[in-house]
């Protein structure tokens, strides 16, 4: 069983919507189309203002893995768009374009699209496609590689179409804010979504495959007097259909401790993943990372320990295997919105032990 690409449904729905729009526009008579144009012309008030940022990267890597040659590659080209409809309602969209394989074909994915209504500091409601609030990393770092210190995400937070084991993206609704009477130190998040699709089912593409919705709740503590410190935990649950249409109970517990300032970074995160099949078999796996960095002027050395331990018999993710890596690198920021990273990685995973690799990445924002 293999995971279905997490973005496939979004592309299909977008394509269907575009096709319907073209057909309706082509078949509408002038008499029916005119009122729509007039209504558009009669819109009053200032048009919403959009802020657009673009993120890009150019990568190079070489590894001791047999049959893999050193190569340059384009990273994700990320368009990040935000806008305010009024002082309480905002919109966020993130569109990523990336090359597919060794050819020049470009794949476009709608990674995030959210409409957020801010009631007050204690309650913000959002609907759309979002990054799930599992742990810290997935909510703090999105598709702009510029903001990440090392090259790439920890293995457990890999994106779905890169073999990730987590539901990184979901479509649904969420609520977040600060807990009253905690001096804004205690934050919460609650999410309800469709969950991740793991088994191919063309008839259910773009929809939840069963009636069970995923839920995720989290709490984090970030006291003002300890600037940069954040301690938190989250719990995710869903029921997934396997190839035999049997329910598999999926649970993800996460806990983290983070200290981040412009000059220093210490991050540690642990996740426990469990899958329980309909016949009562329980599979427990875990993953995590520890990361430190320190900036001296334009130069920032860093280290990351990255680990993913998965039993081969686990439903859906057993073929990912176990992985551990030690990563040592250096980041230099020669100018504002430009960064250059270089790192050495030593990896142990199924069938390949003590593999050495070097990578570089140029990141930029405009």
Residue ranges of model-derived segments:
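Outer membrane beta-barrel
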Residues: 38-196, 211-213, 220-227, 291-302, ...
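A short secondary-structure junction signal
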Residues: 185-187, 199-205, 232, 243-244
